[in-house]
Amino acid sequence: MADLEGITKHHALFVTVPFQGHFTPAANFAIKLAARGFIVTFVTTEGFHHQRAASGAVSVDGHEVFADARSMGMDIRSELVSDGLPVSFDRTLHRDQFSDAFYHLLRSHVEELMRKLLLAEPPIDVLISDTFNVWPSTLAKKFGLPYVSFWTEAALVFAIYYHVHLLVENGHFGSPTETRKDAIMYIPGVPSIEPTDLVSFFHSPEASWRVLRNVGKAFEEAKGADFVLCNTVQELEAEVIGALQQERPFYAVGPIVPASGEGGAATSLWPELDCSQWLHSRPPRSVLYISFGSIARVSKRDMDEIAYGVLGSKFNFIWVIRPGSGSSEASPLPEGFIEACKGRGMVVPWCRQKQVLLHPAVGGFLTHCGWNSILESMWCGVPMLCFPVRADQPTNRKLVVEDLRIGIDVGSIGEVRERKCRGESTA
């Protein structure tokens, strides 16, 4: 550690994982640490950076990611490491190969960087890592550093993964015969949850072994953490947080959104369109915002039914349809949709989501239930229409609709039906 004007400066190595939903809260939390006097070296992969640069979201050098924070005097440094694959490798098309490289090859490159930064001035003195990395506790112990596990999802989802052995023991997951379908009532801090509300990976037989191997290993590492920091709010998940605190030093540190005077990180995968001028021309609470996040893919049938619901509702709307978010067909929307909605809607490839949600013209959010989107929607006071697609989104839907009661169901992937979608659009 170094001493600057009598103040001890801690140097945190912060390693995220290469997905938008993890990168964004990690980058914004890094800024919060730096605003409180930490030196932060923020690490992501060369492949993820190349993806962002190729889309035009950042320049090749990537210096603007923390440009605002650095202009305010914060000491945030950026480092890139290899995930073991060429930067031009299509990680979206070849998910299994990417997953294998991420879980098996990334560690050696992070370890090499750690050796270098232990000789820096000041040297790193704490490791912060996304919980889904499978090596942080091991490396932290190797170099004598405290390890902080950073969880970007809901505490409820953490509890499910943390207690996956209970699902196996009770026959709700990984059963060699028939998997139980009744309510799960034995996870500490979770009074009851239906199997259909579990993370989507638990419903995919071919993914079962990957869940047990990779996520299981990651959570074994998390059990070796000195602290677990979760991007949630104590008051929203008090019961499950209390139960987790009986197991680990577990703290809610959310919602992690940029505060005034901190500066935000440039975290988008794509250039962001400013919709504010169009929103200014709309009456209060008259606009439905629609976005299915940075990864989810929606079938042509579901896109069509949602589009018909939007068309029949007569509401104003902003619909984010990023490249690759729909089916492989040239146009993800029904023929004639754009013309029929002319004058009351915008279809954009990407936008500044929090800016849109904060605008008084926006009265609702049709969301895939990604955790960052849910937190932003709550932060901005916008009710949600829930359409979970994959991963933790079905579990998040349960929180929003059943526990917190700040949203309603549209359906889930493959379940959108004409009456349901068109009925909700006019509710």
Residue ranges and their predicted role:
Residues 1-427:
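Glycosyltransferase specificity loop/lid
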